[in-house]
Amino acid sequence: MNSECILTLDVGNGVVIQDVQLWGNSVETQLPKKGKARVVAHIDTRKLPLWARTRGLFTCFSSSSTTAAYFRAKLLKDRHAHRGIVAELDKLYLVFFRKEQSPSSFQIECIRLNLALKRKFDTQLLQASTVSSQPTMSPHIDEIVAKQSLARAESSLRISRHVQLADYRRQFSSTASSCILGGLRLRGIRESEADYHKIYKMTYSAIEFAFRSELSNASPPISFEQVQETVETLLKVFTRS
């Protein structure tokens, strides 16, 4: 068994794992000696046709504990028994999957997808479609991968937007609460008084309503002075005797 290729693997969210070594016995692997691959999708290996597999089978090794932990988390759980991790490397596609062993002694193997044969089938289907009134074509695997990558990117953007809104609202809430409590203290209204909590809630609800447009869009930035001025105006109304 010879070392065929050493990879770094971008697994998403800015995380890159190191020293993914692919070892095999192939005479011609058609893999670079070194490269940077990128995870693009997860697949069910049971649905991977035999013609998509090349003859070469690689065994993965690594001296990195982080790399081992990644594959253990992604491939060794019971629910991931048939999961394959698809990675793109210089317009080639690799599939990482686990070999059936005990969790304490696991082994990760890798194959290169044979897309040449897939494209040959697609060409034959295209030619046959000229005879059929309703042509049937199966999509290229790279098109499927591209769609999955786009879906993942859109999901990441939605999560990022949600986090941005939550942070914006949390900062506003902290500032508003601080201004309201300070305003109540300046007016000599103690927490033990009957109207203390009622005034606080009314003021907080009113200031949220006043800045509802900014809170729904997380923009533009709301300054401390804006919040304090609005709170003072509201407290003058709510504490007027």
Curated annotation (Swiss-Prot):
One of its GO terms (cellular component) is nucleus. InterPro entries: Sld7_C (IPR041260), Sld7_N (IPR041564). Required for the proper initiation of DNA replication. Required for mitochondrial morphology. The keyword Nuclease does not apply. The keyword Cytoplasm applies. This is Mitochondrial morphogenesis protein SLD7. Its main location: nucleus. Belongs to the SLD7 family. Signal peptide: none annotated. Pfam families: Sld7_C, Sld7_N. Keywords: Cell cycle, Cytoplasm, Cytoskeleton, DNA replication, Nucleus. One of its GO terms (biological process) is DNA replication. It is found in: Nucleus; Cytoplasm, Cytoskeleton, Spindle pole.
